């Protein structure tokens, strides 16, 4: 069964508005990337306590921490990133989730990713070891311009690190924007490692982000295959319909509603079970 979630900061910086829209959409989970205009990794203890109270009052749960870990250059110092990871791990524990989204480091422009393979593996291995110690699962997202931006390098990274604490999340739109056919070229390679999906779609011709099922992301095929295989996990809406950037995106309440409608329609068409 699929469980719907979403990046609530795509709705508004305001927690109250985020929770109101999620309630109106009957979405019971959120992926925490930022709130009150502050990135999740930078929230202080008082903010986390306030957030936890509000979630408890509304019955909304945290599906994952949409962290920025690994969204730095591969040659940037690692110790500060490990310290941020420790803080994110504390926040994940406080908010009751074991899943943390991560990235595999930006490659310097013009350089072949393979040149940095071992450094990426070593760095991701250090993050995975920390995750193992904290009982977390790192869900690696296939972001553009990082080492793991195409299916082959995503699979290579996960197998090379060799930790059950490092798994994959699947972002069809990002694959499209990297010139990949997500289902035809990516699903088979990554299915053994998939624990989570970021839901957005994109047009291959322009890279424009569109609602699920309205682009070239082959989401219908992927969702059908996952349902047929008995996948149990989250589908996290990340619409990017009003604004998309390297470190996040925005859709507004109306855009988020359009994205949620599109995903529900797609799920109904595939006869998948979801809630």
Predicted ranges, named:
Residues 1-8, 12-28, 56-59, 96, ...:
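Histidine-acidic metal/acid-base catalytic patches
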Residues 1-5, 61-72, 104-107:
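N-terminal small/glycine-rich loop or linker at the start of catalytic domains
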Residues 10-12, 34-36, 68-71, 104-108, ...:
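Active-site-proximal loop/turn and secondary-structure-junction residues that shape catalytic pockets
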Residues 13-18, 56-57, 73-168, 177, ...:
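Active-site acidic/histidine proton-transfer and metal-coordination neighborhood
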Residues 31-32, 63-66, 98-104, 136-141, ...:
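Short beta-strand segments at enzyme active-site cores
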Residues 32-55, 105-111:
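Glycine-rich, proline-tolerant flexible connector loops at the mouths of alpha/beta enzymes
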Residues 42-50, 76-84, 111-122, 145, ...:
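Alpha-helix N-cap and loop-to-helix initiation/capping positions
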Residues 47-57, 123-130, 186, 221-225:
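Catalytic-core regions built around general acid/base machinery
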């Amino acid at each position: 069964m699929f469980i719907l979630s979403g990046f609530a900061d795509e709705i508004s910086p305001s927690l109250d508005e985020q929770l109101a829209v999620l309630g109106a959409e009957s979405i019971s989970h959120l992926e925490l990337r930022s709130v009150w205009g502050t990135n999740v990794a930078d929230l202080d203890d008082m903010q986390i306590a306030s957030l936890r109270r509000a979630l408890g009052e509304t019955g909304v749960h945290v599906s994952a921490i949409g962290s920025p870990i690994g969204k730095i250059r591969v040659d940037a110092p690692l110790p500060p990133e490990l310290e941020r990871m420790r803080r994110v791990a504390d926040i994940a524990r406080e908010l009751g989730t074991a899943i943390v989204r991560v990235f595999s480091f930006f490659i310097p422009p013009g350089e072949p990713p393979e040149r940095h393979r071992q450094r990426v593996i070593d760095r991701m291995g250090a993050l995975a070891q920390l995750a193992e110690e904290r009982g977390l699962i790192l869900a690696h997202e296939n972001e553009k311009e990082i080492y793991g931006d195409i299916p082959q390098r995503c699979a290579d990274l996960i197998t090379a690190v060799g930790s059950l604490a490092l798994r994959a999340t699947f972002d069809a739109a990002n694959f499209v924007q990297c010139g990949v056919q997500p289902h035809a070229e990516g699903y088979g390679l990554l299915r053994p490692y998939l624990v989570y999906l970021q839901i957005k779609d994109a047009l291959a011709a322009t890279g424009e982000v569109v609602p699920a099922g309205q682009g070239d992301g082959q989401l219908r095929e992927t969702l059908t295959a996952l349902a047929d295989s008995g996948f149990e996990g989250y589908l996290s809406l990340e619409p990017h319909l009003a604004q998309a950037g390297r470190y996040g995106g925005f859709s507004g309440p109306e855009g988020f509603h359009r994205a949620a409608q599109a995903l529900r329609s797609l799920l109904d068409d595939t006869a998948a079970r979801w809630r």
